[in-house]
Amino acid sequence: MGDFAATITIDQPVDTVFAFLADPSNLPLWLEAVDGVAFDDTPARRGARFRIVRSLPGGRVVNEVALVDFEPEHRVTFESRTGPTPFRYEYRLDRTGHNTRITLVGRISAEGL
């Protein structure tokens, strides 16, 4: 497993940033390897499930993903349930004046590639 963290400040209010991050249909807009998203449930709630198709060095893969934490304007966490590259991405949001600081705490493994 590889653990990592990154922080960025976005020039948008926290409610706007959270709405964008928590909507899995936006993943292809900001995660380069994600080609598409298909929903099993209505997204943007704790427990929602969806599938992502990703282009990886070994070819295209599908991960079933669950939204395991959903705290509006504070935190959203995605965790893979299937696929060759298990991952957990937790996005923590903090209001900084009129901006939003996002801290990503991630864990990913390439064990299935």
Regions found by a protein language model. Give the residues of each.
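Hydrophobic ligand-binding cavity/cleft-lining segments
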Residues: M1-R46
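Short, surface-exposed coil-to-beta transition loops
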Residues: D3-A5, R60-E64, P86-E90
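A short, structured loop/turn motif at beta-sheet edges
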Residues: V14-D15, T42-R45, V68-E73, R92-R101
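A short, surface-exposed loop/turn module that caps and links secondary-structure elements
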Residues: A38, V65-D69, E79
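C-terminal and inter-domain tail/linker signature
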Residues: R45, R51, E64, E90, ...
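Short beta-strand segments that buttress and anchor functional surface loops
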Residues: R49-S55, V76-T82
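Short, cysteine-centered beta-strand-loop-beta hairpins and adjacent loop/turn segments enriched
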Residues: S55-V61, A110-L113
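Beta-strand/loop substructures that line and gate deep hydrophobic ligand-binding cavities in soluble
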Residues: R81-L113
